[in-house]
């Protein structure tokens, strides 16, 4: 970390969640998972899960000044799959999936179903999957267990590397400031699993979505489209989802920034069928 040699004592890291719509980590499929794109493939070589030739010569786009996310995601996914096939479960891995099962199992299942449905939003899935019918989910798990295990493996690798990074930063006197986006994405495991905590009706459609009033960015305001929280439902649940989210973030960062202030200071509750804020 070169920041250590410039006497910098804090490093602010933008949202580290998986990217979703428009390659944005602020429309993430999970409020808890880590972004597979941040996994260092060379560390997988050191673990014997990949060979150097697997990585060398890869083409990630023609313009080095921009990121071709489509190519990067495709290449990374292919290499992570290859590493997964070489991976042998060990004590550390089993401890991780047990400790993180409270969010990891839902996320891995969500991503496996999403993959099976050509990455379409969960709102377009078959009714039994949308409404999480236990017998249908159990059958899917049995049939697609390897896909579910793959997503567990990816998260294990992300968090293993992240923890090493944080330990190294802290050892060098650098604290990490990390983001928590104020809203969850509609197309996320969080909303799919916990629709009653959001402004979602009985047909699993959003009723009110997030945005802000007109400002110098837009004369019609900003319409973000994230479902709002049902704070009454959150209160009845003891704010468990939010407390778990903050507790999880505090294990990854030294300080947490909720992004951003305007989103909960002057937010709008916008009808879901509106075209502007």
State what each model feature region is.
Residues 22-159, 184-277:
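Alpha-amylase-like alpha-glycosidases and glucanotransferases acting on alpha-linked glucans and related
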Residues 2-9:
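Single conserved hydrophobic/aromatic residue that forms the stacking wall/gate
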Residues 13, 110, 169, 179, ...:
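Conserved, mostly hydrophobic/aromatic
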Residues 10, 173-177, 255-257:
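Structural preference for beta-strand elements that scaffold enzyme active sites
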């Amino acid at each position: 970390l070169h920041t250590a040699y410039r006497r910098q004592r804090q490093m602010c890291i933008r949202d580290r969640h998986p990217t979703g719509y428009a390659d944005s980590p602020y429309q993430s499929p999970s409020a808890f998972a880590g972004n597979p794109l941040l996994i260092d493939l060379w560390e997988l070589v050191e673990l014997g899960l990949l060979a150097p030739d697997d990585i060398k010569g890869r083409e990630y786009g023609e313009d080095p000044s921009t990121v071709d996310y489509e190519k990067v995601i495709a290449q990374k996914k292919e290499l992570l799959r290859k590493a997964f096939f070489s991976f042998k479960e060990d004590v550390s891995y089993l401890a991780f999936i047990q400790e993180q099962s409270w969010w990891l199992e839902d996320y891995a299942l969500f991503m496996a179903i999403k993959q099976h449905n050509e990455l379409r939003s969960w709102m377009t899935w078959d009714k039994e999957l949308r409404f999480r019918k236990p017998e249908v989910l159990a059958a899917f798990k049995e049939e697609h267990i390897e896909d579910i295990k793959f997503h567990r493996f990816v998260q294990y690798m992300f968090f293993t590397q992240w923890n090493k990074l944080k330990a190294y930063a802290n050892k060098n006197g650098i604290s990490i400031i990390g983001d928590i986006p104020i809203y969850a994405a509609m197309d996320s495991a969080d909303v799919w699993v916990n629709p009653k905590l959001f402004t979602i009706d009985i047909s699993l459609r959003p009723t009110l979505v997030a945005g802000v009033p007109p400002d110098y960015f837009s004369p019609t305001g900003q319409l973000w489209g994230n479902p709002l929280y049902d704070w009454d439902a959150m209160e009845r649940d003891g704010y468990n989802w939010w407390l778990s989210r903050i507790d999880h973030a505090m294990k990854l960062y030294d300080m947490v920034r909720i992004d951003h202030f305007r989103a909960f200071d002057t937010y709008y509750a916008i009808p879901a069928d509106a075209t502007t804020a």
